[in-house]
């Protein structure tokens, strides 16, 4: 599930397909025939060696210096053999009629980053899915759609909205390429005029682009269109006395401001802490700001 696999083999040919496991998604297949090959260390994804093998092959688990740690004989009826990240291995045919197929897998949250080079799934989304089960979900301000696409891949019923028609078109194109049932459309968040109810509404690093005077109405609209027992997740930059924001954002939260908007909700997480943006400064360093991260559950 990466756009450019770091494994090195003598022969390789990738046929991309989606193959889902419970917690992992498959990115590509590699087919080998005729001679031995060595797979160097790979990181961040799982490699499953399918038993689509003509005749037999011997698999060696290796140390970095080539020392053999274990040997396995694979035949067409051997089932699936799994090699985990940070492992080296070598496959050698035991006769001339040899073919093997490899499948590469990674965590679903890394799928679109590794396969398509998109921004990685936001850490707050990764954490939220440990609490919020698959449900009807709204991504407010989806941008390129990396969070919405991950959630759709993970089984959530996702609608993604953004003010940019180009961003929406890009998300829909990616969803179609990956055969995901994700909805996306253009929407002005400042209008605070949602027309559907959801179990989970989130806005990650979006409020900084919104009209400051519309924020109370936007949050009230989010809350009104969250079903009882549903969740809101907001991550946004802050401007506080101890950590002033020098970026030209249209809006930043003050200390404890977001908490007050959700005084009647159950705050499952509320954190005001220094963090890094994906954007960089003139020296190429990630911009450091104070952020508020909140996951709140609506009563009911």
Swiss-Prot record:
InterPro entries: RmlC-like_jellyroll, SAM-dependent_MTases_sf, TehB-like_dom, Tellurite-R_MeTrfase_TehB, Tellurite-R_TehB-2. The keyword Mitochondrion does not apply. Signal peptide: none annotated. It comes from the Bacteria. SUPFAM superfamilies: Clavaminate synthase-like (SSF51197), S-adenosyl-L-methionine-dependent methyltransferases (SSF53335). Gene3D superfamilies: Jelly Rolls, Vaccinia Virus protein VP39. It is found in: Cell membrane. It is a single-pass membrane protein. GO terms for biological process: response to tellurium ion. The keyword Electron transport does not apply. CDD domains: AdoMet_MTases. GO terms for molecular function: S-adenosylmethionine-dependent methyltransferase activity. The chain crosses the membrane at residues 200-221. Keywords: Cell membrane, Hemagglutinin, Membrane, Transmembrane, Transmembrane helix. One of its GO terms (cellular component) is cytoplasm. Induces agglutination of neuraminidase-treated erythrocytes. This is Hemagglutinin 1. It comes from Eikenella corrodens. The lineage of its organism: Bacteria, Pseudomonadati, Pseudomonadota, Betaproteobacteria, Neisseriales.
């Amino acid at each position: 599930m990466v756009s450019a696999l770091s494994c090195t083999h003598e022969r390789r040919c990738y046929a991309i397909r989606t193959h889902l496991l419970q917690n992992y998604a498959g990115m590509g297949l590699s087919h080998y025939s005729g001679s031995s090959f060595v797979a160097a260390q790979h990181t961040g994804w799982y490699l499953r060696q399918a038993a689509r093998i003509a005749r037999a092959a011997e698999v060696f688990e290796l140390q970095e210096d080539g020392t053999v740690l274990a040997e396995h004989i694979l035949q067409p009826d051997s089932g699936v053999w799994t090699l985990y990240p940070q492992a080296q291995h070598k496959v050698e045919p035991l006769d001339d009629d040899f073919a093997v197929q490899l499948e590469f897998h990674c965590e679903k949250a890394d799928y679109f980053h590794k396969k398509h080079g998109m921004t990685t799934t936001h850490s707050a989304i990764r954490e939220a899915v440990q609490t919020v089960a698959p449900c009807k979900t709204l991504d407010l301000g989806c941008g390129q759609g990396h969070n919405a696409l991950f959630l759709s891949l993970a089984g959530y019923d996702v609608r993604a909205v953004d003010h940019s028609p180009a961003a929406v078109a890009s998300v829909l194109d990616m969803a179609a390429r990956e055969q995901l049932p994700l909805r996306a459309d253009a929407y002005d968040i400042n209008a605070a005029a949602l027309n559907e109810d959801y179990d989970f509404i989130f806005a990650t690093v979006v409020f900084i682009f919104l009209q400051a005077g519309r924020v109370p109405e936007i949050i009230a609209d989010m809350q009104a269109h969250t079903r009882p027992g549903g969740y809101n997740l907001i991550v946004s930059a802050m401007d506080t006395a101890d950590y002033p924001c020098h970026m030209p954002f249209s809006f930043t939260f003050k200390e404890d401001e977001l908490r007050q908007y959700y005084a009647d909700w159950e705050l499952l997480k509320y954190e005001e802490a220094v963090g890094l943006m994906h954007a960089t400064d003139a020296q190429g360093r990630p911009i450091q700001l104070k952020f508020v991260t909140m996951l709140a559950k609506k009563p009911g």
